[in-house]
């Protein structure tokens, strides 16, 4: 029979394990030279080998013949009873077999110890990496001095060089020693995470190391993206390395300059967040509209970041380039660019932003834990900026204005701003009138509001248009709502004097319904506008308003 036939396994057994189990010494001796190595080392389903069976049946010579042909694993295999060939031989008293197995074990242990010694004898490169990881700069520097370029340029199993380790651990002096001794290829090495020594140096804020590395880097590695989609420019901006950013920008591709990382940040957002005004000004002309208007994962735009950092010029440069959505953007804490601009007293920015912003965005209130509930108007009241206050009032909700007036002690400048604002809504004035302490102040605001409507009315009448009457009645409705709503709400005796004052004001003020009629008379007499221009229905409406206000004299004037 040939080797292939003899080496077959049947039900987990070979002919050799059968012969050994049955104690057939001569059969075993004849089989061993003809069996394959795999068959000799075969382990049956009970964990026994031909060697363990030979030991059980006392075939010492067969054991001695098998041992040199078997693997260490098969010799030391433990069967289902927990026995090895050596333990069986000891139980059986097979001295020669025990000595042989013990010698093999001792030899194996010596080999293990020798290998351990070899593996524990560390190379200079391994020692250097250990020193860097331990941040032992003195030890690392001492090792570098005695190492050649080939040793220093090795890449370890984690795809790191000594230089990337030193840069990642922020060891500036170690990096300074390494750079002159390393090849350009290793300096430009990109690890499995997309990092280079330069990206690590930028991440660690090592300005001098970045300066030393950049001239040695290829265009490709300078524009390399990390696994977080960061460029070295974004990383340098994050660490406020303005000088490095200045050096990098001319070397970066358009794609790299407009790159968005996994946090949604661009180099521009990073630079603005780090107060790098010059870098922002250098980046903006090079960036696409899409990148300039990009919103990061936290809801911030470059404009919000610039306003937050107090970069007035950057904001002024950005605003004309921002979309309506980006200008009105509120971040995840509901802070807008306007809130930050007002908070940082960026008056010019506020003046440009406010007309461009929606009512909702202007009245957005912050959920930031440091200024929870603050709106742009809240910051105005804290900063005491009357001019910005005047700009905000027409777009600020009455509720916000009333709440601020109730809470703040310094009300005077707010009242003055309201008084000087021609666009204060009737609702705001009505609500402010309800604040007892502010009623006298608001008389001025009422006068202001009426005077503005008078001017508008005169302009309308000058147009000599029959539709003017309709516009006039709309104006009267606004006026009527302003006072009538207040008078119906406040009916206590305490408010009687003020009520009388307001009624007198109504009678004497130029822009009452009666005042409108008086204004019409000279124009009728001069044929500039004729009473026939007004329909009977419109005249009836005017008369109704006048009668409701009990102004009989003026009604008679109209006929």
From Swiss-Prot:
Protein name: Putative ankyrin repeat protein RBE_0902
Key words, A-Z: ANK repeat, Repeat
InterPro entries assigned to the protein according to its UniProt record, in alphabetical order: Ankyrin_rpt, Ankyrin_rpt-contain_sf
Gene3D superfamilies, A to Z: Ankyrin repeat-containing domain (1.25.40.20)
Superkingdom of source: Bacteria
Transmembrane segments: none
Start and stop residues of the ANK repeats: 11-40, 46-75, 81-110, 158-189, 228-257, 263-292, 298-327, 333-364, 372-402, 524-554
Claim: Repeat is one of the keywords in the record: yes
Keyword Chloroplast attributed: no
């Amino acid at each position: 029979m040939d080797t292939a036939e003899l080496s077959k396994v049947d039900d987990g057994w070979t002919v050799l394990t059968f012969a050994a189990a049955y104690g057939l010494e001569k059969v075993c001796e004849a089989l061993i030279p003809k069996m394959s190595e795999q068959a000799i080392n075969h382990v049956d389903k009970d964990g026994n080998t031909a060697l363990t069976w030979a030991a059980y049946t006392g075939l010492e010579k067969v054991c001695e013949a098998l041992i040199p042909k078997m693997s260490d694993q098969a010799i030391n295999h433990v069967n289902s009873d927990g026995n090895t060939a050596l333990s069986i031989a000891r139980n059986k008293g097979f001295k020669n077999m025990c000595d042989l197995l013990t010698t093999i074990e001792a030899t194996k242990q010596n080999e293990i110890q020798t290998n351990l010694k070899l593996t524990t004898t560390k190379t200079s490169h391994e020692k250097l990496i250990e020193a860097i990881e331990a941040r032992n700069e003195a030890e690392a520097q001492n090792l570098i001095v005695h190492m050649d370029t080939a040793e220093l340029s090795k890449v370890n199993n984690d795809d790191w060089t000594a230089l990337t380790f030193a840069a990642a651990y922020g060891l500036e002096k170690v990096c300074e020693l390494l750079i002159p001794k390393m090849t350009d290829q290793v300096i430009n090495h990109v690890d499995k995470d997309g990092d280079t020594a330069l990206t690590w140096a930028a991440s660690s804020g090592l300005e001098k190391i970045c300066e030393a590395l950049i001239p040695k880097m290829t265009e490709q590695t300078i524009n390399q993206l990390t696994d977080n989609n960061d460029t070295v420019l974004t990383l340098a901006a994050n660490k406020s390395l303005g000088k490095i950013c200045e050096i990098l920008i001319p070397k970066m591709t358009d794609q790299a300059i407009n790159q968005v990382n996994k946090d949604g940040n661009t180099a521009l957002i990073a630079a603005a967040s780090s107060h790098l005004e010059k870098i922002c000004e250098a980046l903006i002309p090079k960036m696409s509209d899409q990148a300039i208007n990009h919103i990061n994962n936290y809801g911030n735009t470059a404009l919000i970041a610039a306003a937050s950092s107090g970069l007035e010029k950057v904001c002024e440069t950005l605003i004309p380039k921002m979309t309506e959505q980006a200008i009105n953007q509120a971040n995840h804490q509901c802070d807008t660019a306007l809130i930050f601009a007002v908070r940082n007293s960026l008056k010019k920015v506020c003046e440009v932003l406010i007309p461009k912003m929606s009512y909702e965005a202007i009245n957005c209130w912050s959920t930031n834990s440091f200024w929870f509930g603050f709106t742009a108007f809240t910051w105005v009241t804290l900063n005491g900026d009357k001019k910005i206050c005047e700009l905000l009032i027409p777009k600020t909700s009455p509720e916000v204005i009333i709440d601020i007036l109730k809470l703040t002690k310094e009300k005077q400048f707010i009242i003055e701003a309201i008084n000087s604002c021609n666009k204060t809504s009737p609702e705001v004035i009505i609500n402010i009138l309800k604040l007892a302490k502010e009623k006298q102040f608001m008389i001025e605001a009422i006068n202001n509001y009426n005077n503005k409507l008078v001017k508008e009315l005169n302009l309308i009448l000058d147009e000599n248009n029959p539709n003017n009457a309709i516009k006039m009645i709309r104006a009267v409705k606004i006026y009527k709502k302003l006072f009538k709503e207040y008078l119906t709400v406040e009916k206590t005796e305490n408010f009687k004097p003020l009520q009388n004052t307001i009624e007198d004001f109504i009678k004497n003020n130029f822009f009452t319904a009666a005042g409108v009629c008086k204004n019409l008379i000279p124009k009728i007499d001069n044929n500039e506008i004729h009473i026939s221009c007004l329909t009977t229905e419109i005249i009836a409406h005017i008369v109704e308003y006048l009668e409701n206000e009990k102004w009989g004299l003026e009604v008679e004037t109209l006929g």
